[in-house]
From Swiss-Prot:
It is a lipid-anchor. Keywords: Cell membrane, Endoplasmic reticulum, GTP-binding, Isopeptide bond, Lipoprotein, Membrane, Nucleotide-binding, Phosphoprotein, Prenylation, Protein transport, Transport, Ubl conjugation. Interacts with ROY1, YIF1, YIP3, YIP4 and YIP5. Required for transport in the endocytic pathway and for correct sorting of the vacuolar hydrolases suggesting a possible intersection of the endocytic with the vacuolar sorting pathway. May be involved in recruiting the MON1-CCZ1 complex to membranes enriched in phosphatidylinositol 3-phosphate (PtdIns[3]P) or other charged lipids, leading to recruitment of YPT7. Present with 9380 molecules/cell in log phase SD medium. The gene is YPT52. It holds the Pfam family Ras. Residues 131-151, 206-234 are annotated as: Disordered. Signal peptide: none annotated. This is GTP-binding protein YPT52. Belongs to the small GTPase superfamily. Rab family.
Length: 234
């Protein structure tokens, strides 16, 4: 089993916690309270990499740090992303300034961590809430039977996708509420990390097997970090 550290970043109310809980517990809570500081969860997936002519199952365990988005907690974020293998940077597609705030997080990651072997995934959340363009006519009965007000998309898919391509980021739009695209996020990350770390994985596997470990091989691939303040609890 391979172990990777993953961190979620983004401003308050973009849906970071909802994405994590949809992935880990397959639940959604409309009234979820804001995260204080950070929350830790873990979940495993199976990927099917093709090494040469052989396809095999590989189990990946994600150690997930869900950080608070409020401004007063922003200074704590480096404690959690410093030695992460992957970062999910989340924005709200219905809020006009949300993508710019996500860009700021990406800039911070690249400046303070670097992106040589850090997988950064840009996520546009809340696709379930919006109509693609403003409606020219509104019927008084148009929301009859509906529980949720529809919103106008404020950030186009094309704008966010182009930015992600320019920055070398993975990109996807998702809905934590319906689950659309959420599982695919973590499959994408698992496959990308396996490809990036393949040589290191094989080397560590061979050393463990050569040392007499013929059972399950557990490999922690968390990025090294000096004076890491989270080392006592991660």
């Amino acid at each position: 089993m391979l172990q990777f550290k993953l961190v979620l970043l983004g401003d308050s109310s973009v849906g970071k916690s909802s994405i994590v809980h949809r992935f880990v517990k397959d639940t959604f809570d409309e009234l979820r309270e804001s995260t204080i500081g950070a929350a830790f969860l873990s979940q495993s997936i199976t990927i099917h990499p093709n090494d040469g002519n052989e396809t095999k199952d590989v189990v990946i365990k994600f150690e997930i740090w869900d950080t608070a988005g409020q401004e007063r907690y922003k200074s704590l974020a480096p404690m959690y992303y410093r030695n992460a293998n992957a970062a999910l940077v989340v924005y709200d597609i219905t809020q006009e300034d949300s993508l710019q705030k996500a860009r700021n997080w990406v800039d911070e990651l690249k400046n303070k961590v670097g992106d040589d072997d850090l997988v950064i995934y840009l996520l546009g959340n809340k696709v379930d809430l919006c109509q693609e363009t403003p409606s020219t006519e509104t019927s008084p009965d148009s929301n009859e039977g509906g529980d949720e007000e529809q919103k106008v998309r404020a950030i186009s898919t094309e704008e966010a996708k182009q930015y992600a391509q320019e920055q070398g980021l993975l990109f996807r739009e998702v809905s934590a509420k319906t689950g659309e695209g959420v599982k695919e996020i973590f499959q994408d990350i698992g496959e990308k990390l396996y490809d990036l770390k393949k040589d290191e994985i094989l080397s560590k596997q061979n050393r463990q097997i050569g040392g007499g470990n013929n059972g399950q091989v557990d490999i922690n691939l968390q990025r090294p970090s000096t004076n890491d303040p989270t080392s006592c609890c991660s």
